[in-house]
C-alpha cells in the first residue's frame, strides 16, 4: 500500500515539506529514524486525495495528532492520559516547538498506531475523539 508523506529530516532536524509517495515501510523507516533522534513531525495522506491529512508531532514519549479534514478545518485528537492533568508538553510542529495541554497528548507509540490505522483505512472518525480548532 502506498502513502503520500512529508517529514522531518533526521540528518538536519528540519521539516522537509516536499511530499514523497512510497510504500508504508519507507514511512515506517523514517519514523523509526526520527524516534532515534528523539523528536519529529510527519504528515500523511492518501495518494489519491488531497484531504484528509493526518500529522503526528512527537518528542520523546509524548505526541500530538492533528487532522486536517479540508482546507479550512483542523482537529486535535483527544489525549490518552499519558501526562498528568494540567501538564503541558512541547512537540515540534513543522520546525517550531508548540505547547499542548494534557487534553491532547498521547503516548508516541499509540499515536504512531493511529497514523498506521489511518493509512490502512483512510478514515479518521474511528481513530478516536476529535476536537475542532
Question: What positions do the PLM features span?
Answer:
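Amphipathic, interaction-prone secondary-structure segments
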Residues: 33-73
Amino acid at each position: 500500500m502506498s502513502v503520500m508523506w512529508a517529514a522531518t529530516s533526521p540528518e538536519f532536524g528540519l521539516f522537509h515539506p516536499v511530499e514523497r509517495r512510497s510504500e508504508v515501510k519507507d514511512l515506517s523507516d523514517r519514523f523509526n529514524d526520527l524516534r532515534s533522534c528523539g523528536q519529529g513531525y510527519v504528515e500523511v495522506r492518501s495518494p489519491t486525495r488531497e484531504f484528509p491529512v493526518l500529522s503526528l508531532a512527537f518528542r520523546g514519549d509524548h505526541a500530538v495528532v492533528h487532522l486536517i479534514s479540508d482546507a479550512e478545518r483542523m482537529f486535535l485528537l483527544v489525549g490518552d492520559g499519558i501526562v498528568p492533568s494540567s501538564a503541558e508538553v512541547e512537540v515540534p510542529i513543522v520546525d517550531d516547538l508548540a505547547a499542548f495541554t494534557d487534553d491532547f497528548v498521547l503516548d508516541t507509540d499509540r499515536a504512531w498506531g493511529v497514523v498506521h490505522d489511518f493509512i490502512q483505512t483512510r478514515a479518521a472518525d474511528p481513530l478516536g475523539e476529535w476536537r475542532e480548532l
